[in-house]
């Protein structure tokens, strides 16, 4: 696989080619995922839960994200590397630019932020500083306490319209990609069709431009609560490399996510 740039990912949307994204937190897994054809690797603040053992992502710091982004970057040759800005690290435009700059210096090619149209000025300023932005809408884990837990978003008409509006506003502001988490498939399809930029789903059905999974979910090593939208690809293959190959293949041909991984 040749090097995947943001331009190439956007062309994949235009051509209908599905985008396979997965999280990674170290160089070894990043290299393996890169070798097996994953298009994009996300250094997620999910590391707070799956690496550090917290109950949510809120304790993750910018220093944590810089450390893991640098580790992952050393293992990536081709995939588009995206890194999360953690909780409260982009609460104002100045902080967002400083902290995003640190992630880019560590090797990220794009940063991801959680939230809606109130972030438009932040997105514009990040773009002015040469930093591409991915927006995260729907179930945004940094707002878990505001939502009253990890709950599906957009099932009622008002909330669905809000999410749709935020997606359009953020695209206008300059966002180059959107992650939609835990929203009904019908809403995800509507947003995907409305946007020019790639829409990556996690628990958002099969009509998005691509899928992302936490690596521990994809490899079946998550303990405790197992999200409905996850699938254990290792169980079908018995080999980590083959599991990732199967994930990329099933995203590409539309087999994943299936109906049992989808919310309506």
From Swiss-Prot:
Q: What is its EC number?
A: 2.1.2.11
Reactions that this protein is recorded to catalyse: 3-methyl-2-oxobutanoate + (6R)-5,10-methylene-5,6,7,8-tetrahydrofolate + H2O = 2-dehydropantoate + (6S)-5,6,7,8-tetrahydrofolate
Give the principal location in a single coarse category.
cytoplasm
Localization recorded for this chain is: Cytoplasm
Q: Give the main EC class.
A: transferase
Could you give the cofactor binding note from the entry?
Binds 1 Mg(2+) ion per subunit.
Identify the cofactor(s).
Answer: Mg(2+)
The UniProt function text for this chain reads: Catalyzes the reversible reaction in which hydroxymethyl group from 5,10-methylenetetrahydrofolate is transferred onto alpha-ketoisovalerate to form ketopantoate.
Family of this protein: Belongs to the PanB family.
Q: What NCBIfam families does UniProt report for this protein, alphabetically?
A: panB, PRK00311.1
Official protein name in the record: 3-methyl-2-oxobutanoate hydroxymethyltransferase
| Organism of origin | Tolumonas auensis (strain DSM 9187 / NBRC 110442 / TA 4)
Taxonomic lineage: Bacteria, Pseudomonadati, Pseudomonadota, Gammaproteobacteria, Aeromonadales
């Amino acid at each position: 696989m040749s090097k995947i740039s943001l331009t190439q990912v956007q062309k994949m949307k235009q051509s209908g080619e599905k985008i396979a994204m997965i999280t990674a937190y170290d160089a070894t897994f990043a290299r393996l995922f890169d070798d097996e054809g994953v298009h994009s690797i996300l250094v997620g603040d999910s590391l707070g839960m799956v690496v550090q053992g917290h109950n949510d992502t809120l304790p993750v710091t910018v220093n944590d994200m810089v450390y893991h982004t640098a580790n992952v970057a050393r293992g990536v040759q081709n995939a588009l590397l995206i890194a999360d800005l953690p909780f409260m690290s982009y609460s104002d435009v100045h902080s967002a630019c400083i902290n995003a700059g640190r992630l880019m210096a560590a090797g990220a090619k794009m940063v991801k932020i959680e939230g809606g149209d109130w972030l438009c000025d932040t997105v514009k300023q990040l773009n002015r500083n040469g930093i591409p932005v991915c927006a995260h809408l729907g179930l945004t884990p940094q707002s878990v306490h505001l939502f009253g837990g990890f709950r599906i978003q957009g099932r009622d008409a008002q909330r669905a319209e809000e999410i749709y509006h935020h997606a359009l506003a953020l695209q206008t502001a300059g966002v180059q990609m959107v992650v939609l988490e835990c929203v009904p498939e019908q809403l995800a399809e509507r947003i995907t069709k409305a946007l020019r930029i790639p829409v990556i789903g996690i628990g958002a059905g099969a009509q998005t431009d691509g899928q992302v999974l936490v690596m521990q979910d994809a490899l079946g090593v998550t303990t405790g609560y197992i999200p409905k939208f996850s699938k254990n690809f290792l169980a079908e293959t018995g080999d980590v490399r083959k599991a990732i190959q199967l994930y990329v293949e099933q995203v590409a041909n539309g087999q994943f996510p299936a109906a049992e991984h989808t919310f309506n």
